[in-house]
Amino acid sequence: MDLIQPKDGPRTEYHKNGQKLTEENYKDGKLNGKWTWWYENGQISNEGNYKDGKRDGKQTDYYKNGQIREERNLKDGNLEGKQNAWHENGQISEERNFKDGNAEGKSTKWYANGQIEIEGNCINNRPIGKLNSFYENGLKKLEMNFKDGKRDGKETVWYEYGQIKEERNHKNDKLDGKQTWWYEYGQKRREANYKDGKLNGRTINGWYENGQIKEERNYKNNRIHTNWTWWRENGTKHSEMYYIDGMKRLKWTWWYENGQKEAEYHFKGFDYGTRDGRSTNWDENGQIEAVAIFKDDECISGDYDYFKDL
């Protein structure tokens, strides 16, 4: 059965075990004055004040053990001034400032062990300037910059024990410029270039332990454009595909370790399986082993049996 909301005076609700659940006051049909909520064990869970139906003044939330969880200040229903929160062990967990309901000034979060987790600044609810994030062991996890609420400039990410993980650059909240990733043991993992949030230019995916590049691609407006190349650890080229506008694969070439061309196939369109034009295979001495001419993936002349399963 629903409780009838009074126009004036108190309203009280109870838990099933008989303990008080809520106590609120009304004036002219609106919440007004002190309100309190309780846990089933009789411990206060929340308390605060209303003014003309809106939360106003200090509001406090508690853990079941009686420890304060959060203290908020409100004005006309909006957060105003300093807001604090605590871990259940009593250690402060968060400190923020608000103006007219918007985050304003410095904000800090802490781990339960007292170590800072995040610290940054806001103006009118928008992050601005440097934001730092830390691991629970105290080492830095993230450093980034904001301008007018958007990511701008260099951003750095670290692994838990101090090794650099990522280095990114933003402009107007979009990736822009060189971006670099590392493995936890320090070896560079990937390197890419962006413009206005899209891959543009050279991207390297992996290096051998001796520093030799494993794979390299070129992009234009987020699509593979021109060469996609693989190398062996000794620096010789293994294979290379040539693209136009992303998936239009036009040519695929392989090389032997001695540098001699092993095979070269031509394609057309977006379909990976559509061979079109000349397909050639060589032996390690540069002598042609087989040649065929394809049109729309059908062999129209040459050594079909050699190429049919390729």
Predicted regions and their residues:
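Glycine/tyrosine- and acidic-biased, solvent-exposed loop/turn segments at the edges of beta-strands
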Residues: 1-310
